[in-house]
Amino acid sequence: MSMIQADGLTFSYPGSPDPVFRDACFQIDTGWRLGLVGRNGRGKTTLLRLLMGEYLHEGNLISSERFDYFPSPVPEPERLTAEVLEDLCPEAEGWRFPKELSLLGVEEEALWRPFSTLSNGERTKVLLSALFLREGRFPLIDEPTNHLDAQGRELVSAYLRRQRGFILVSHDRRFLDGCVDHILSLNRSGIQVQGGDYSTWQEEFDRRQRSEEARDERLRKDVKRLRQAAARTSLWSDRVEASKIGAYDKGFVGHKSAKMMKRAKSLAARQEKALEEKAGLLKDRETAEALKLSPLDHHARVSVRCSELEIWYGDRRACGPLSFSLEQGERAALEGPNGSGKSSLLKLLLGGPIRYTGELALAAGLKISYVPQDTSALRGGLTESIRARGLDESRCKAILRKLGLSREQFDRDLADYSEGQKKKVLIAQSLCEQAHLYVWDEPLNFLDIDARLQIEALLEQSRPTMLFVEHDRAFQEAVATKTIRL
């Protein structure tokens, strides 16, 4: 196996005052199944793009590998899927296509359908298979789970576990645990490489933080004690100096004064050393402040009621018949495979032009806050976006700061935000809305793990009435009080 090495890697986006990487150094083996983790905006996708040679940088980034990036664009998507695969990996023999796709749960007939007619999950699996069908390429896989249902994530995780050598960006904890054997984390103070899965890395990271917190507390007490001792020594020294006036044994007094001055210097040196050590601690601690939400109470006990509900796409039934009720304080997870009508049901609740039969009843005057999957509508200034929705600007920006966005980020065009940062904007705006019901469609796509944990804690503590779609199993199990299966 060969190595990928960075030595003094430095990179900034044009016009940005802060570098994404400054003198970064790391070394990784191309035989590793490497998980790349870090908060949104920390530079995960940027690092992949640097490896692809798309950006100019300072320092050295050395590798003999030829890299392939996922997701890759598909020109002429109206062509048959088999033709798309032939173009992406011309050296692969045709019989390998159905074999590889079967490992990902894709039927062979998908090869003879236009690529454009495949579901988002099927497209993801086809493009992933192409990565490993190409010879002599090292895969760089950026967020493959965003369009995959729970079963699809399990299949892709098992598929990647069979492979050898790739870099994977993902924020799904269980998905990472299932398929990686090393972690490269982009921390606040630099880059760390560690063997093991994500949970192993997180346990070690937390252990190190606890150790540093304990050391920080001991040093804080030491500094306080040394300052008090220095103050006493200074007071004693002043008194001794004063006693020299008219003292009979001036040699004795001078010797005593010199000893105290020496002790004072020693205390000052120890204090400075303790402060230096203290300054080197906790540089990687992520400050994840608690979020707050105050949902509105509704006079009706039941917020949503469906009876024999069926959703139709033309003459095809997408889902149903479906019967359920959602009471105040319940957080219901909509569960079903890709294409089962989950997003359509949410849009129907919002009054969208969705054809349905059966009964759907919402409580009178029900106010709904919605987080869509798609972030493409976010453009222009953040302040203008907040004001356009009639929201409290200060509160919304305070939430975004808690979710890890810097104040400098607020001045940038929303179109230049990373996908994870855009999702944080949508979630922050939803949390600022006064609503009886929160409807969130795959809110965690592209969202970093720290933000996921913050949102988990918020929803468990504030207990809003909620209907959501989310394929992150750990999040769903932590948040949902009931599951509605389509």
What is each PLM-predicted segment?
Residues 56, 134, 274-278, 293:
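Intrinsically disordered, low-complexity boundary segments flanking structured domains
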Residues 279-304:
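Coiled-coil termination/hinge junctions
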Residues 1-212, 298-486:
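ABC ATP-binding cassette signature C-motif
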Residues 61-63, 233-243, 264-265, 282-291, ...:
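Short, highly charged low-complexity linear segments
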